[in-house]
Structure formats: C-alpha cells, structure tokens
C-alpha cells in the first residue's frame, strides 16, 4: 500500500538523496518538503514548499504530513556554517525537534534522522551534545518506529565551504572508503545514505509490535549496508 513521506533538509547532501530515492520508491505515492530554498527537482509525486520563516515549518508539516507514514530529516549544520553556537543549536536541535513534534501530531509512524557518530546528550562537546539531545528527545516522542543513522564523514559535493581540516579529512576518507582502513574514518557517501534511509524506512513495522521501535545504525553498520547496495 502506497504512503506519503515528508523530507526536511532536501537541499542538503543526505536530504536531497533521500528525496531522490523516496521519489523512486513505489512505497511513497506523495512526497513533500519545505525549506528556505527548494531543491532542483521535478516530479508529479513531489510537493515543494518554499517558506523562508522556519518558525512556520511546524504548522506546515502538521498539515501537509497528515496521513503520511514517514518523516525523513537530513537537516543539519556546523558551528562554522551556522555562524555561532547559539544558531547551530537553533538549527540542529530547535528546528529538527519542532519538526518532529509536528510530525508526531500529524500521525507519522516512522521518523528517520540523520545524526552523527558518538552522539551523547552528556558530552562536553557542543556538536556531539546537541546531536545526542536531539536523538533522546525524538525517541521520547515515541513514534511507532524511530530510525537514527549515525554516519561518519559524509562524502559528496556540497555547496557550502568546507574548513581546511574537514577538506583534508575528506580527502583521506576518499582513499579509505571501502577498504580495511575505513574503520578509522568510516566515510559514507550522501547517495548511499539516501538509499539506506529509504530502504530501512520501507521495511514494514510488525503488526504485532506494541512498543516503540528504536533502531540506531552506527557508522560501521552503514558501511556494511552500503556494500550491499
């Protein structure tokens, strides 16, 4: 039976690929996305909603995702790109959590989140702590199924400027991808992430399931899943 999917962060590295693979999937007959900018994507299945004010997104999500089965979030930033720690938290935690609450109100069953390795709400490091708090609070919403993907370094073309350090790490990762050294950097391509996210969300929730399901997929597990694509 076909269902609907809502995608947040569809202009990003992972979000755009989730949009691509969700559109190809026979599971989803309608896909919606909202953002300040819209992806360069045309399909009769896809409803693109442009809204510059992210404070209005929860209301849009709650209305648009009514009856949808799945919500994908690839929305994320870095402290450098966000411009400040406060703005980073507002984007990575605030917007994502508000969207998750709206998706829950809309009746979404499966929530898929692109997170980060070592996410921990008790960490002393802002990036890891913010990711961990978001994971914990989304799990607490008790979707029928929550899927959290924790990729290592994400590879692929990005419009935004990378720091010199990140560029060096990414350069090394391209040579370790798929070999025995990959455990050191555990890179993942955006295209792989999109396909894996959609594949996992496409698996049926057991009808006998009474408790919320939480699947946390580590960077190593993502690497193993990518080899099977």
From Swiss-Prot:
Family: Belongs to the FMP52 family.
Cell compartment(s), UniProt: Mitochondrion outer membrane
Domain of life of the organism encoding this protein: Eukaryota
Keyword Mitochondrion found: yes
GO biological process, one term: import into nucleus
Transit peptide: 1-45
Keyword Membrane: yes
Keywords of the record: Membrane, Mitochondrion, Mitochondrion outer membrane, Transit peptide
GO cellular component: mitochondrial outer membrane
This protein's name: Protein FMP52-2, mitochondrial
Membrane topology recorded in Swiss-Prot or TrEMBL: Peripheral membrane protein
Organism, as annotated: Scheffersomyces stipitis (strain ATCC 58785 / CBS 6054 / NBRC 10063 / NRRL Y-11545) (Yeast)
Main location: mitochondrion
